[in-house]
């Protein structure tokens, strides 16, 4: 068989069933799933080589051959000519049977011929006859002959080849009494065995030694190649094909002389004989269908009392003849047989089908049984064919006729439970119900890992191990760290922490840490700096770090950051240094951007470059001041001489001290009235800045930015401080690295970033990545708008070519190629997105579901922020999120960006009911028309604190009004009047305030409120209706349906007034 072959095809070719092939493949180390699986050509060759080496393999469920006693008879051979009827035999004579001749091998006919039409079978009833003892061999077993069966269609005799004597072998092909052999009609191409003489018995025409044989001949094997087991051939059914018989078996009531035995070797062969092949072993033991006397083990005397019930000796046949239906097998109990206990079939081996069986085991015909079919002849639990007597209770046997090998149903028979055998095995059991799995099925299921799913997977517990997780990590990330199932962690979080989280959702840091404590792990959240460091290390990159010994360092200019309180003159001082007017270009006269400039100052006759960074002094620009302090070498702290130290002054000083940079104090506005520079020196002494004239090491310089006084002294102090305390050197021949100070979206140039190079040289054409933005440097501009080809350390330039606007404060570095820059930026975007989702979602817990439902009713103000530079947008967002007007109103910024207001922003605002805040930007294109059409409100601001003030007022206006109770007046009841169709009316005297109609009232009796939430429905002054009655006047007050009014009660009226929110 070339190429791949299926298991059932190999089983058919080898003449075994599929289970045997599967077992053999497993023994050879090859795992095959089922009978329809394919195997490779090398495995097929190895399998074929293994079968001849092992001999005839034994399939599960078949009976094995056993050695028989010596001196047994021979097996009769099958006939070679079909179509001739056998001669009638004598009537059954009970007696001690001798050894039975074993049937010989089948001789196939040269060509199949159709059988003659069947003749009506007439049942022959055998009369009981006194048994005559017959001397048997010492190894024979006592047994009684079976009752005669009805004669079947006669078949021609055929000479058979005698076989050598061998031990007895139980024949699984014994015919059933009372049923026709061969299924009532000879099958085409099936030879019919003759009724020749048997060894050890009388010749033709005389009585047989073991009693009469069965009524008809057994069909022989089909000529040609041997057929596969029925369980492996999907195109054959047991009821249509020939029975895989090893040869005809003489049975009781057989007409004609017994067949001639065939000599066989006495050595037993392991395994089950295949159909159509000679069977090893000696003669079959006597009993029903025996051709000779049954051997008696140990020379035991015959059983007294004549034949036992069920032995077949002289017993009438079963009712029903040959064609009657067989009743349910479950209604019969095991019948005792003529053999010793545990040996069904008389002298057969235990568990083998044959003549009489032991109690509780399938055995021979145990007396009259209704039904025209014999019982199943096989070991319990094994599919046997027709043949040997009644089957076990509850298991109907196969049809009448020659019995097949154990495990294969006979021709014309049926599988278990009376159902036709399937393509890959015998049919089901006789009784309904669920079948039990065999050991092999359980073993294969266990080996294949087909286990039932278990509820509640185990989670490995820790012993305090540290686990590093990034911000916004999911439970799947946690499971990867501890080698657990993410679904199990979801279950743990839900059952033990009460939070509903999926395996892939981003979790908050608190949730991850609490889960770690629950499972015995120490969860460490990786900081953004460490995350970025690990990301760059994955690309063999690094930011910052120490210089190597082989790196050549060059001197660089100092980076000076000007810091201080708002309106203390920082930008004006820079204008004086640069001889420019930056303040005039700032809205509101305050700095709202961080700017970087490089100027050349003459110090001691030398022109020294100095890089200045201007930071805003407004309180909302804390992040800008912090970034300025991080990238600077020297901080110039500007303090107004007339104003002194202010909150932002202290904050700027703290930033400088945290960065560990030296500070130079510039006392500005010394020319202004009321200026007191000494006071400033004294105040800063409290914060650790001691002037040199006071014995400290901090240089104080008195300057006037307006009059440009003592500017050279300030520059000299900066240079001296840099030379004295700083080593201003950096490498120039390495990849450029630095910090993005500011970013904006230019209408004609696209994203523009102001970067400060810290090391290396930045050139046009380099691939750079800054935060989540990446690109290639298309052009570089200086502070005056001139082109720059390359920028060295401490040089601020504007870089064009980014794909998006970098955030202020992002680190930038040059990478080898654009692909690496894009991958780094994408990973940073994913990391930030996960962190934002973890913070924004806020996992719902079982305890906070109702609270969140209530929060859904809370009023919320949605905003979209657009600004000119990223630093201003960041400062505005931080300032707005700090506004707190109460829990009833929330502020949510759904989008922010740099650049003009676009139509996309308008559509997003329309869908989310948001307000657009434009900071130093205007609408683009038709955004204004679209906003008017969609009803979207757009606010424009150029000063940041104006935007903050308006948003705060809007939030306060969205608050729900708060009401308080205001007392209007009280009236004392003097008399109670009964008015028809109205009720009781209180004649009262107004003691204080005013009593008005339709106001709320309460009734007080003896200082206790009797009724509350009443309404003054009627108010009269004498007979006239009145709207209000003032103090000192009498009136009649009706409280509607409330009539429990008594004299001396007090009626108090009040109203709810709205209280303005603070």
From Swiss-Prot:
Residues 34-463 are annotated as: Disordered. It is found in: Cytoplasm. Residues 668-671 are annotated as: G4. Residues 704-706 are annotated as: G5. Residues 555-727 form the tr-type G domain. Residues 564-571 are annotated as: G1. Residues 614-617 are annotated as: G3. Residues 589-593 are annotated as: G2. Residues 198-214, 307-324, 344-430 have a biased composition (Gly residues). Keywords: Cytoplasm, GTP-binding, Initiation factor, Nucleotide-binding, Protein biosynthesis. The keyword Repeat does not apply. InterPro entries: EF-G-like_DII, IF2_II, IF2_N, P-loop_NTPase, Small_GTP-bd, T_Tr_GTP-bd_dom, TF_IF2_bacterial-like, TIF_IF2. GO terms for cellular component: cytosol. Residues 122-153 have a biased composition (Low complexity). GO terms for molecular function: GTP binding; GTPase activity; translation initiation factor activity. Belongs to the TRAFAC class translation factor GTPase superfamily. Classic translation factor GTPase family. IF-2 subfamily. One of the essential components for the initiation of protein synthesis. Protects formylmethionyl-tRNA from spontaneous hydrolysis and promotes its binding to the 30S ribosomal subunits. Also involved in the hydrolysis of GTP during the formation of the 70S ribosomal complex. This is Translation initiation factor IF-2.
